[in-house]
Curated annotation (Swiss-Prot):
Assembly behavior: Homodimer.
Residues that, per the record, bind substrate: T57, C58, N59, R60, S113, D118, F119, E120, Q124
Species of origin: Flavobacterium johnsoniae (strain ATCC 17061 / DSM 2064 / JCM 8514 / BCRC 14874 / CCUG 350202 / NBRC 14942 / NCIMB 11054 / UW101) (Cytophaga johnsonae)
UniProtKB keywords: NADP, Oxidoreductase, Porphyrin biosynthesis
List of residues binding NADP(+): G193, T194, G195, K196, I197, G198
Matches recorded under HAMAP family: Glu_tRNA_reductase
Site description Important for activity, residues in chain: H103
Protein role: Catalyzes the NADPH-dependent reduction of glutamyl-tRNA(Glu) to glutamate 1-semialdehyde (GSA).
Encoding gene, per UniProt annotation: hemA2
Lineage top rank: taxon: Bacteria
This protein's domain notes: Possesses an unusual extended V-shaped dimeric structure with each monomer consisting of three distinct domains arranged along a curved 'spinal' alpha-helix. The N-terminal catalytic domain specifically recognizes the glutamate moiety of the substrate. The second domain is the NADPH-binding domain, and the third C-terminal domain is responsible for dimerization.
Official protein name in the record: Glutamyl-tRNA reductase 2
Pathway: Porphyrin-containing compound metabolism; protoporphyrin-IX biosynthesis; 5-aminolevulinate from L-glutamyl-tRNA(Glu): step 1/2
EC number(s) on file: 1.2.1.70
GO biological process: protoporphyrinogen IX biosynthetic process from glutamate
Length: 434
């Protein structure tokens, strides 16, 4: 039987920082770009971490993985980001075992998103999962857990209305612009950066402002051109950024840089400028606010905008939580099955030994003993008996550990079953980690 090969003291953890306790500056320090995530995985592998997934978005940076102590994972995060242990302690959270599993379900189904019902995080989890899998850092439990969370996310999205209505960071950005800039249709709008949020914001700008003066600039021009071709907006070279800044009425910054790309020195303004910084880490230096007429709005302020759509979404939280409970029960059933399998296998072997011994005894006493018929009958009886035991062990109301101990004592099969390893995850999820 496949096993996890887990050390005795290994625990499953979910730890990180999110918008709930960490502001944009702190989240920026712990933000991990693609290279940093790759480096973290390689370091984890070198340090003997068997299974781990790392995600980093504008709203959260998290690690899900197995370790002897959470510090092993915290160390990985701090050594591959610009954050310190002290900063982590002040703003982070650490969950273990059952709580860690529950946290991943809430994150993956949009219940823990900064904007309720925003499912963008599940695509990040999928990408992170695939990256870890390529490095051989996904064990059987984490594989099953992530796939169950993905299924739960799909069910919540399709079977509830928790994501109904237009509510996202990009939508909130455009609504803020419309509410705060008069005659928006005639203003010059500059979008700097065409990542996921940048693309979505551009689409919303075109759709809701009816503005024909939207300009895109990206360090890699062909990415901007691909987006511009779909939306019929203007593309300019990165070299033209300073000139375009001079002409802009509204600037939306959505680059993926690790340091500010816009600062006071970049701007030589002769009219008011509204700047929306949708980046983590922040890509607009706070010193731009020293310039008269400049208004700087950051991602977190936009995410706090609530409206009727969000209130309607909240009504569907109970339905989403019911789906999560069902999927967690399904996961737990699978885990129970993995734990009881060695005992069931040993029980079947013990019953076969009893039958074989009885056959050998009876063949000496019974003339014309029919081996084939007795093999068929005994096999069917043994299968039915083991099925009954397996069904009992997999029942959600069964105390699996006590039942396994009872079966092993009655049939004296403790030595036949593989040695079981105790660990917190085994205790919580009744899973065999031998």
């Amino acid at each position: 039987m496949e096993n996890f090969n887990m050390p005795r003291s290994t625990t499953f953890y979910a730890l990180g920082l999110s918008y709930k306790k960490a502001d944009a500056v702190i989240r920026g320090k712990f933000s991990l770009d693609a290279q940093a995530q790759s480096d973290l995985l390689l370091q984890a592998k070198a340090e003997g971490i068997e299974s781990l997934v790392v995600t980093s978005t504008c709203n959260r940076t998290e690690i899900y993985g197995f370790a002897h102590h959470p510090y092993e994972l915290i160390k990985l995060l701090c050594e591959n980001s610009n954050g310190s242990i002290e900063e982590f302690q002040q703003a982070a959270y650490i969950y273990k075992n059952e709580e860690a599993v529950s946290h991943m379900f809430r994150v993956g189904t949009g219940l823990d998103s900064q904007i309720l019902g925003d499912f963008e995080i599940i695509s990040q989890i999928k990408t992170a999962f695939n990256n870890s899998k390529q490095e051989g850092l996904v064990n059987t439990f984490l594989d099953r857990l992530v796939n169950t969370v993905i299924q739960a996310s799909k069910k919540v999205k399709t079977e509830t209305k928790i994501s109904s209505g237009a509510t996202s960071v990009s939508f909130a950005s455009v609504q803020y612009i419309i509410r705060n800039v008069a005659d928006i249709g005639s203003k010059n709008i500059l979008l700097f950066g065409t990542g996921k949020i940048g693309r979505n914001t551009c689409e919303n700008l075109v759709k809701h402002t009816k503005n024909s003066h939207i300009t895109l600039i990206n360090r890699t021009k062909n990415k901007a051109e691909l987006l511009a071709g779909k939306l019929n907006v203007i593309v300019k070279d990165y070299a033209d950024l300073k000139q375009e800044l001079h002409q802009a009425d509204v600037l939306v910054v959505a680059t993926g840089a690790q340091n500010p790309t816009i600062d006071k020195a970049s701007l030589a303004l002769q009219k008011p400028l509204l700047i929306l910084d949708l980046s983590i880490p922040r890509n607009v230096d706070a010193n731009v606010e020293e310039i008269p007429g400049v208004t700087l709005i950051h991602l977190d302020a936009l995410s706090q905008i609530t409206d009727d759509t969000l209130e309607r979404r909240k009504q569907h939280i109970p339905a989403a939580e019911a789906i999560i409970d069902d999927m967690k029960l399904e996961l737990n059933t699978w885990v129970n099955g993995r734990k009881c399998a060695p005992t069931i296998h040993a029980l079947k072997s013990k019953l076969n030994d009893i039958v074989s011994a009885e056959f050998a005894f009876q063949k000496k006493k019974i003339t014309h003993f029919d081996d084939a018929q007795m093999d068929l009958i005994s096999s069917r009886i043994i299968q039915k008996l083991t099925n009954h035991f397996a069904s009992h062990l997999k029942n959600e109301n069964t105390s699996v550990d006590q039942s396994i101990e009872f079966i092993e004592k009655i049939f004296q099969i403790g030595q036949l079953a593989p040695n079981k390893t105790s660990s917190p995850i085994a205790d919580k999820y009744k899973i065999n980690l031998s």
